[in-house]
């Protein structure tokens, strides 16, 4: 094996040189890993803020604000009461109908879990109480496990799918 210019012929320098290279590589990986943590935390904060705006828009029955938070795509998917609603426009039509009655979301912030699937895709999970009632009918509260997938677009994070799973009565 060829020795580096600063290595001794007896191998001691070779050992030190290899150790130094391994140590440098390890340190570089450590710093790289530390640098990605703030980026992940920043993305999670952006996703959390988008979810908070989604809840506020829902509770205000602000269809324009909801529209701006949904992915504008025919591939947007919302599964409600076992029925898939495909597409941005169909979802807005359904939300508009629900807003005629009682429609309120009360998330349980302590249960919020955001999983970054990739740089531009996040999964949101949170227990949430839905208060729902058709026009002229008494509203009922139901606990759901809300699942959403958000994607990052040029305009920011957008909800690309919504899957609320009802929690069975205990």
Q: Which stretches of residues belong to each language-model region?
A:
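N-terminal secretory signal peptides that target proteins for export/translocation
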Residues: 1-19
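Short, low-complexity N-terminal intrinsically disordered segments enriched in polar/charged residues
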Residues: 28-69, 73, 170
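A solvent-exposed, acidic/Ser-Thr-rich amphipathic alpha-helical stretch
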Residues: 45, 63-117, 141
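Hydrophobic/aromatic beta-strand elements that line small-molecule binding cavities or substrate pockets
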Residues: 95, 109-114, 128-130, 145-151
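Short, cysteine-centered beta-strand-loop-beta hairpins and adjacent loop/turn segments enriched
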Residues: 102, 130-140, 168
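A short, structured loop/turn motif at beta-sheet edges
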Residues: 114-122, 150-156
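A short hydrophobic beta-strand element
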Residues: 120-130
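Short beta-strand edge/turn micro-motifs at domain boundaries
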Residues: 143-170
């Amino acid at each position: 094996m060829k020795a580096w210019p600063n290595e001794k012929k007896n191998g001691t320098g070779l050992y030190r040189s290899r150790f130094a290279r391994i140590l440098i590589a390890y340190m570089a990986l450590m710093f790289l890993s530390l640098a990605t943590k703030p980026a992940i935390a920043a993305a999670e904060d952006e996703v959390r803020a988008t979810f908070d705006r989604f809840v506020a828009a829902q509770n205000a029955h602000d269809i324009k604000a909801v529209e701006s938070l949904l992915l504008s795509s025919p591939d947007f998917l919302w599964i409600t009461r076992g029925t898939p609603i495909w597409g941005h426009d169909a979802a807005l039509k359904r939300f508009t109908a629900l807003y005629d009655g009682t429609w309120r979301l009360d998330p349980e912030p302590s249960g919020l879990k955001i999983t970054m699937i990739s740089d531009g895709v996040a999964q949101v999970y949170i227990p949430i109480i839905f208060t729902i009632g058709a026009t002229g009918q008494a509203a009922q509260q139901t606990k759901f496990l809300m699942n959403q997938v958000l994607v990052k677009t040029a305009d920011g994070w957008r909800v690309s799918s919504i899957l609320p799973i009802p929690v069975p009565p205990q």
